[in-house]
Amino acid sequence: FTPWRIGNCEIKNRIVLTSMGGTDLFGWMEKNHFDKMGARFLREAAKNNAGLVLPGCQPVYNPMFGQWLYKNKKMYEDLKEWMPEFHKTGAKLFVQLTAGFGRSFTISEMMEKLYTNKALRVLSKPFMDLDKITATASPSPNRWSDKVPSREMTREEIHEFVEAFAKSAKLLQDAGVDGVEIHAVHEGYLLDQFTLKYVNHRTDEYGGSFENRYRFAVEIVQAIKKVCGEDFPVSLRYSVLSKTKGFRKGALPGEQFTEVGRDMEESEKAVKYLQDAGYDMLNCDNGTYDAWYWAHPPVYMPENCNLEDVEHIKQFVRIPVVCAGRMNPKTAAESIAAGRLDGAGFARQFLADQEWVTKMMEDREEEIRPCILCHNGCFNMCHYKGVPNDQELSDSLHLSRCAVNAETMQWDRHFIEKTKNPRRVYYRRRNRRDGSCQSVKAS
């Protein structure tokens, strides 16, 4: 719980609430409205001792309705009004801006029908231009569907995105936001697709050599620094290793395989290159959407599954390095104390219990409601019967609900009321340390 700095920005402790889809400040489904439910969640986490808070990623080009983020000035005015309330918590806020998904865009059956029917594709283009949304570094198969392939982005489109990042960052700075995070040379999202040789086969200045493959990410930070100043912090969401064997083929922990994406030799070079380009922090994990479980670890992934690789690349940079991915708080604290890490990233645990950091600080760990790593409410690719995610379509993306906390992001629908008829009850409580149970009486 010691302070640290990202550039000139001081963060009160080492706990980082990392981005999750659905915790956005600007909703996607209603043309980038200011999302009060997302804002409430973020403030609750900040109030309960998250030091650095990162909302869900904001596309600089909205895949719904095709609107550029910098063009809707009203939501920045709403954000500016809200920021003083947030800053009362003592936390800092970095808004995560994304270039989008490229070939990783999740394709539903409805989208397949829209794309494969020429008439429907034309009619749907004003509100969902799948051809533009799924464009990537080079022609590639979509991660989820064989029916919606990704075309190559044009140079003009790349330049449009670079300009949009700079304009959006400046508006966020003027609204009082403490910094931005660029999404992402991470998890096989669009920017990452440009860096990965198995996706990028371009022959222009955005493909081929190492410098060309990382050019898109470099131009973004340089454009932001030009309009916001060198002191405005810019973090980068970064996957150390791709852990990928090929399209739709991910590697498992301990598996011997040939890496088709970013290996450690390239990563050691890349982190220094990106630091020297102007990035002020690396927010790290592993994986691509072809190996998605490294960045969104389910229950069968080991604790701290990305920590060893993240600790390794910290040796090659001077800027702060954060690690996320099923982090154990005590292990993270040991790594930070030893100087092998600067910050610890947590995400879904905040959905399960927004007060968990406060409870840990007050030695009330037995009261923490743990994330059970099920993905049922927080990850919309995992829709089982009885899924706890009952959002309406007008909500942002059907994400960031929780199987063990019905109130999270649904306070207007699910809330606990004090009973008018109190009774004594008995229940069995499990000790999180040794697994033993005890009977407890409560009123």
Give, region by region, the residue ranges found by the protein language model.
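Flavin-dependent oxidoreductase catalytic cores
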Residues: 1-443
